[in-house]
């Protein structure tokens, strides 16, 4: 063996070790070789009992495994320790929607029981509690910054809506008195205009006529029952609403007018279809005839029916199978369109009667 090989082997133990110590998050406790490995854990069990007061972060239960599950306002740690998320009172309870599980929760009020109803909103404090009644009242009246900055605009728009409602009530009262000839005293007219205003609001929200009238009547009855000084006006309300329903109807543009029965609507619709059947608009006179005929359509037809008829008889542009001219002239319109099939620009010459706006 050569000298250099012997020197190299002699220096190998002197080299620094490549082993690096790794620190872990937990430390295993030291124990004797003969100690029992299955001995019971120490310092486990409930730390707070039923009805006991707890603060945020206080430990309620130490356990190995989920013997108890976290309920309302209770959190669970990685070692299954249950702790309070809100200040309150400890409750041990069972949840019928989770059979076989025992829960620990924190009630925010001393007389509050858990669990609350399954579909009821949760009672939460978000980690904050105002012990002073004056501070709590101030906090309730406080507005978010965005709302505070827009407060003037919000109040202004609310006042504008209130003024618009009063104006509509005045218009309804004028129509009932002057156009429909309903003889109502002051109290009955107030009830009638309020009822019609609510019916109009429901119609704008998408309800049909029957549902809109039912909802308006139901709302007024409930509010009248909850107001002791107005309970005596219940008979007057029913009588007024019956007379108003028999004398009024709303158009599809939400305009108030005389009552139109279902028979009248069907007869008007059939007469309109008979009058316009097979009509092809070629002149301005024919166009004006259709416009005049559809003027009262909003009173007899629903909005969808009126739109369907207008699209059928008042088409802005006729299909290209009609009113196509052979050569350009004074009464024609030239249209240039790119043809993606041929890659060229096609020239289409159409008569002016093909366009409704040019008649």
UniProtKB/Swiss-Prot annotation:
Pfam family for this entry, one: Ribosomal_L27
Function: Component of the large subunit of mitochondrial ribosome.
GO cellular component: mitochondrial large ribosomal subunit
Signal peptide stretch: none
GO molecular function: structural constituent of ribosome
Protein name: Large ribosomal subunit protein bL27m
Segments for region (Disordered): 29-48
Entry keyword set: Mitochondrion, Ribonucleoprotein, Ribosomal protein, Transit peptide
Chain segment of the transit peptide: 1-24
InterPro entries registered for this protein in UniProt: Ribosomal_bL27, Ribosomal_bL27_CS, Ribosomal_bL27m_C
Family assignment from sequence similarity: Belongs to the bacterial ribosomal protein bL27 family.
Major localization listed first in the record, in broad terms: mitochondrion
GO biological process, one term: mitochondrial cytochrome c oxidase assembly
UniProt key word Magnesium: no
UniProt feature, compositional bias: Basic and acidic residues: 35-48
Disulfide feature: none
Entries under PANTHER family matching the protein: LARGE RIBOSOMAL SUBUNIT PROTEIN BL27M (PTHR15893:SF0), RIBOSOMAL PROTEIN L27 (PTHR15893)
Compartments (UniProt record): Mitochondrion
Superkingdom of origin organism: Eukaryota
């Amino acid at each position: 063996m050569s000298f250099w090989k012997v020197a190299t082997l002699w220096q190998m133990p002197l080299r620094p070790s490549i082993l690096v110590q790794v620190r872990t998050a937990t430390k295993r406790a030291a124990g004797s070789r003969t100690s029992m490995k299955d001995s019971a854990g120490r310092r486990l069990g409930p730390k707070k009992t039923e009805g006991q007061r707890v603060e945020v972060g206080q430990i309620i239960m130490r356990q190995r495994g989920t013997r108890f599950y976290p309920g309302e306002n209770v959190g669970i740690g990685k070692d299954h320790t249950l702790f309070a998320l809100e200040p309150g009172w400890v409750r041990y309870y069972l949840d019928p929607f989770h059979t076989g599980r025992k829960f620990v929760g924190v009630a925010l009020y001393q007389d509050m029981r858990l669990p609350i109803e399954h579909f009821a909103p949760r009672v939460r404090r978000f980690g904050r509690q105002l012990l002073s009644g004056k501070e709590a009242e101030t906090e309730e009246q406080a507005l978010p910054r965005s709302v505070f900055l827009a407060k003037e605009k919000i109040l202004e728009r609310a006042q504008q809506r209130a003024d618009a409602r009063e104006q509509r009530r005045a218009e309804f009262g004028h129509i009932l008195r002057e156009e429909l000839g309903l003889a109502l005293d002051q109290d009955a007219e107030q009830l009638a205009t309020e009822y019609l205003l609510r019916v109009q609001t429901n119609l704008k929200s998408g309800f049909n006529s029957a549902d809109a009238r039912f909802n308006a009547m139901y709302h007024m009855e409930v509010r009248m029952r909850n107001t002791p000084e107005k309970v005596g006006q219940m008979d007057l309300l029913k009588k007024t609403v019956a007379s108003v329903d028999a004398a009024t109807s709303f158009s599809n543009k939400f305009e108030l007018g005389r009552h139109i029965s279902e028979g009248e609507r069907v007869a008007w619709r059939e007469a309109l279809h008979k009058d316009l059947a097979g009509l092809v608009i070629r002149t301005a006179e024919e166009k004006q005839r259709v416009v005049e005929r559809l003027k009262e359509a909003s009173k007899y037809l629903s909005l969808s029916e009126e739109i369907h008829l207008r699209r059928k008889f008042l088409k802005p542009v006729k299909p290209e199978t009609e009113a196509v001219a052979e050569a350009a002239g004074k009464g024609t319109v030239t249209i240039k369109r790119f043809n993606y099939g041929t890659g060229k620009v096609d020239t289409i010459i159409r008569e002016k009667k093909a366009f409704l706006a040019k008649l």
